[in-house]
Amino acid sequence: MLLHAPLFGAIALSACSTDSTSGGDHGIPDLDGLANFIVDSARLASSWTLGSDYVEAGSCTSIEYGISPGTHRVLRFTVSTPNIGDADAVVGDPLAHVDPNHDGDFSDSDGLFEYAPCHNHFHYKHYATYELLPVLAGGALGTPIFARKRGFCMDDSEPFLPGVNANSWVYRACGTLTTHGIQGVHTGWSDVYVRTLPGQYFVLDDPAQPTPPGEYVIRITVNPPYLPDSTDACPVRDEQNFCRVLRESNYSDNVATLRITLP
């Protein structure tokens, strides 16, 4: 998700190349093969910055990300997760996952999405993790601090691979309670979360997780391994029997790290 507005109305995979609301021609889904996600380490290295963020009481940032009202010192960064595989990563319509029988009752949800009422759209769970790890004496890494971002809307934000046509995007509709969406990342494209998005940062002055000056490592993992709880889905098992939300041709290139100094 960069800053694209969602497409409205029911959207099927077969309709993506002809949907009249797109404002022009765009791509055709490529489902022959497997996706392969990486984290753009160069984008991470060039985008991180220190600053402040004022959080209003009752705002979506405060409610959804659990940040106390007031001005906070934050570490912002942009995350770009390109799909360099030979096929699309397709999630589809969130409503089909949370309400498969279309009765308005989410009790039969498959657990892949959670509804964010403040923003009135669905967040895809377990797409990525953002960690800030202190570098301890001897070079070991300490207990991670997690960024406040909790959910994701997968889309074709930017072309990534050379030669990719800027009009070849397929997936750009997050979906809401009343509009169908289609989430995914087309081969050769990247899903991008720019540093100015709400919650796209580490809170550095949280008294529960103090972040003193020193050396740290930012670690971004796309499609991370996880152990499911009672509300989670487990669509894919990797070679170590961990759950993944997306099937890929290669899970070994899903992490980017960056060592930084916090003054």
Q: What do these predicted regions represent?
A:
Residues 1, 10-30:
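Ser/Thr-rich, Pro/Gly/Ala-heavy low-complexity intrinsically disordered linkers and tails
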